[in-house]
Amino acid sequence: MRVADAATKHGISEEDGIYAASFPIWVAPLDDDPAQWRELRLGFDTHARLLETVVVVASDGDELLIHAMKA
């Protein structure tokens, strides 16, 4: 998973954002484009904090973390 610069603006490290987004406990699609869409994901980081993340997912499986903050 790649990480956009904007994903760390709320003080969440790349490692914690990736961990929470990679092991979500809840996922909701934000778009319905079959080629590329955004997903809202809730998951715990490496410090057991619940994070809200937004990931852009491409149809080829590529993922880009664009948002991460404490939920």
Language model features with spans:
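Ribonuclease/tRNase effector modules and their secretory precursors
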Residues: 1-71
